[in-house]
Every structure is written in structure tokens, then in C-alpha cells.
């Protein structure tokens, strides 16, 4: 389920706050990786909270988006939401197959990211 550690740039400072890029470099374990979103944890313990990060749409190039090593080259990832495990009893918990991202510039639409990392329906 987990892949090797990568260094991510542009993480947000606090969960559940408005999107705000930071110039910090932190190390995380990547649980799942989509084209424009990744789920990360600091531990392999699935009882720990995870974060869903969304790639800043104004950053990177087409080459970076298609590259397997894009995490090393795309500088800005923004915090989207905290994924709280079911054993914590939170209604905010999201399953891996149910990550939802707001559609940029749209009203009411959502973008889903499946567990295998493919982007689905807009």
C-alpha cells in the first residue's frame, strides 16, 4: 500500500484552514497517488490521520504531470483535507475510494480520485 518516502513542497500549515502554500519541505509516506492528488501519512500505522494533498493547478509542466518522478519536480502541493480513520469515530472520515476534490472554477461539481489513483468523473 505504501511507496517510498518522497519530499513534498508547498504543504499547508494547518488542517481545515483555507488553502495557503508554504515553503516547507517535509517527508511523508505516500499511500496512494493520483494524477493531481495524493494521500500521505507520516506513519504506516493506519490508525493515524492522513492528509489529502492536491497539486496546485498553476504549477508544473505537462512533462512533470506525466512523469513517474513528478513529485520530485512539481514544487507546489496544497492541503485539501484530513482523512480521519474510522476507528476514531469521525463523520469526516473518507475512504480511499471516496476522495472528493472541488472542481476548479465550477459550481457543484466534484472530482473523485479512486484507490488506484485514476481521476474519475467531473
Curated annotation (Swiss-Prot):
It comes from the Eukaryota. Belongs to the FAM223 family. This is Protein FAM223A. It comes from Homo sapiens (Human). The lineage of its organism: Eukaryota, Metazoa, Chordata, Craniata, Vertebrata. The gene is FAM223A.
Amino acid at each position: 500500500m505504501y511507496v517510498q518516502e518522497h519530499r513534498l513542497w508547498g504543504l499547508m500549515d494547518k488542517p481545515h484552514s483555507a488553502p495557503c502554500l508554504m515553503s516547507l519541505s517535509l517527508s511523508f509516506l505516500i499511500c496512494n497517488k493520483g494524477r493531481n492528488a495524493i494521500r500521505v501519512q507520516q506513519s504506516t500505522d493506519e490508525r493515524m490521520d492522513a492528509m489529502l494533498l492536491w497539486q496546485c493547478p498553476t504549477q508544473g509542466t505537462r512533462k512533470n504531470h506525466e512523469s513517474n518522478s513528478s513529485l520530485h519536480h512539481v514544487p507546489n502541493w496544497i492541503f485539501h483535507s484530513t482523512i480521519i480513520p474510522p476507528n476514531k469515530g469521525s463523520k469526516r472520515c473518507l475512504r480511499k475510494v471516496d476522495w472528493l476534490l472541488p472542481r476548479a472554477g465550477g459550481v457543484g461539481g466534484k472530482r473523485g480520485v479512486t484507490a488506484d489513483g485514476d481521476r474519475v468523473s467531473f
